A protein has these predicted regions:
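Extracellular glycan-modifying ectodomains
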Residues: 2-6, 10-377
C-alpha cells in the first residue's frame, strides 16, 4: 500500500514535516471512519492521487489498443477491397471501367429459339427475320481486362449462334464493326449498355442490313446528363467511390432530317410526341430516359412512307437503338418479352409486320428464356 511504502522510507525528515504528515493521516482516518467509500490514499506532497488498488489506472489502455486494432483492420479491408478485380460477375479494369463477364450460353434455349424462328418463316414465307446481338465490352475490349481474368470466347459463342440459325434468318454482325471502332467510346464504363455513339453504329448496321435508307445529313448530339451512373456502379469497389468520377455523359444522336413521329404505349394507350423522358435523365435511373423505362409494348408511327412495319423483339439494350429507326420505317412495334406474354405470331397478324428484328445484348440472349415464350405458335 502507499502508506506502507511511505512509512518504510529511511530518509530522515524534519519534525515539522513529520507533524504535517501525522495530521494528514489523522484527518484521513476520521474521514474514513465516517464514510468508507473513499478510494484514494494520500502520499507525500509530490505524489498525486491514484485510483485505489490500481483497478482504474489501466482502463484507458485497452480502449486505445482496441482503436488501433480497428484502424488496422479497416486499413486491411480497404487494401483487400482496392486490390479486388472481380465482383459479382464484373471485372474492374485499370482505367476504372467495369466489364461484364461473358456468360455461358444456354444451349437448349438457343436451339429452341432457332427452331421457332424457322417455324415462323415456314408459316409466313414473306416475313423477313434478322438477329443482331450486341457483344459485351469484354468481348470487344479484352486488353482492358485484368491480367488474371480468364473469360469465355464470346466471339466463338456468337459465331456458333449464327451457324445454327436457319437460312431464312439473317445475321447482323457487330463484332467486326465494333472491333474496327474499339478505340471509340462504344460502351458505358459503369453499365452494359451502348453509349449514344455505340448505339448509332449499331442502328446504322441494322438499317443497312434490312435494306432501308440511312437518313441523310448530320446527326445532332444532345447531352441529357453528365452524371450517368449505371448498374455496375453498385458493384464497384466501395472504398474507391469517394475518389473516382461520379458519372458519365449520357448522350443521344438525332438525325437533322429525322422523320416526324408519335408513339403509343401498348398498355395505357397514352401517346407522346417524343421517345425520350427528359425528367428521367436527371434521376437515379437515368437510362429510363429511353421510352420512360422498360415498356411491354410500344407503337411508333412515322411520316416515312414505305409500307414497312418493323417488329423489334429485344431487351433493354435495344432501348437506345430503336429510336434511331424512326426515319427508316413507316411503323415500328417494340416489344420487351420479359414484360408481356404476347407472341410474335399474334403481333405479325395484328400489325401486318414485314420485318422482325431480334435485338439483344449478347449475354441476355445467351440465357434469357422469355424469348421462347414470345416465339411460341
Amino acid at each position: 500500500m502507499a502508506f506502507e511504502k511511505h512509512a518504510a522510507q529511511e530518509e530522515p525528515v524534519s519534525a515539522g514535516a513529520w507533524e504535517k504528515k501525522q495530521k494528514r493521516r489523522t484527518d484521513m482516518d476520521k474521514a474514513d471512519s465516517v464514510k468508507r467509500t473513499s478510494t484514494y490514499a494520500v502520499t507525500d506532497d509530490a505524489e498525486k492521487s491514484k485510483p485505489a488498488g490500481g483497478t482504474r489506472a489501466g482502463s484507458g489502455l485497452p480502449i486505445f489498443l482496441l482503436c488501433i486494432l480497428m484502424i488496422a483492420s479497416g486499413m486491411g479491408l480497404m487494401y483487400k477491397d482496392i486490390s479486388r478485380t472481380f465482383r459479382h460477375g464484373i471485372y474492374r479494369c485499370e482505367y476504372g471501367g467495369m466489364l461484364e463477364e461473358p456468360r455461358e450460353p444456354d444451349d437448349e434455349k438457343i436451339t429452341m429459339a432457332a427452331g421457332s424462328m424457322e417455324a415462323l418463316s415456314q408459316t409466313y414465307p414473306n416475313l423477313q427475320q434478322y438477329v443482331m446481338l450486341v457483344p459485351t465490352a469484354a468481348c470487344i475490349l479484352p486488353d482492358y481486362l485484368p491480367e488474371s481474368a480468364e473469360i469465355r470466347d464470346q466471339k466463338a459463342d456468337l459465331a456458333n449462334i449464327q451457324s445454327r440459325l436457319p437460312e431464312s434468318v439473317q445475321w447482323i454482325d457487330l463484332v467486326q464493326l465494333f472491333s474496327d471502332h474499339s478505340g471509340e467510346k462504344l460502351y458505358y464504363a459503369s453499365d452494359r449498355y451502348l453509349t449514344g455513339w455505340g448505339s448509332r453504329y449499331a442502328a446504322r448496321a441494322a438499317i443497312e442490313a434490312m435494306g432501308q435508307k440511312i437518313p441523310e445529313g448530320k446527326d445532332q448530339c444532345y447531352l441529357l446528363s453528365n452524371s450517368f451512373s449505371g448498374r455496375f456502379a453498385m458493384d464497384r469497389i466501395p472504398s474507391l467511390n469517394y475518389f473516382e468520377s461520379s458519372g458519365e455523359r449520357l448522350e443521344i444522336y438525332v438525325p437533322e432530317n429525322e422523320a416526324c413521329y408519335y408513339r403509343v404505349d401498348g398498355r395505357s394507350k397514352k401517346w407522346s410526341g417524343s421517345l425520350y423522358d427528359a425528367d428521367a435523365a436527371q434521376s437515379t435511373a437515368a437510362y429510363n430516359v429511353f421510352f420512360g423505362g422498360e415498356k411491354a409494348l410500344t407503337e411508333i408511327h412515322t411520316t416515312r412512307i414505305n409500307a414497312e412495319t418493323l417488329l423489334v423483339i429485344g431487351d433493354r439494350t435495344a432501348d437506345s437503338i430503336v429510336p434511331l429507326f424512326v426515319s427508316s420505317f413507316e411503323n415500328i412495334v417494340f416489344v420487351h418479352p420479359s414484360k408481356t406474354p404476347v407472341t410474335v405470331e399474334k403481333l405479325v397478324k395484328k400489325y401486318n409486320v414485314t420485318k422482325v428484328l431480334y435485338l439483344y445484348g449478347a449475354n441476355e440472349y445467351m440465357t434469357d428464356r422469355t424469348l421462347l415464350r414470345t416465339l411460341q405458335q
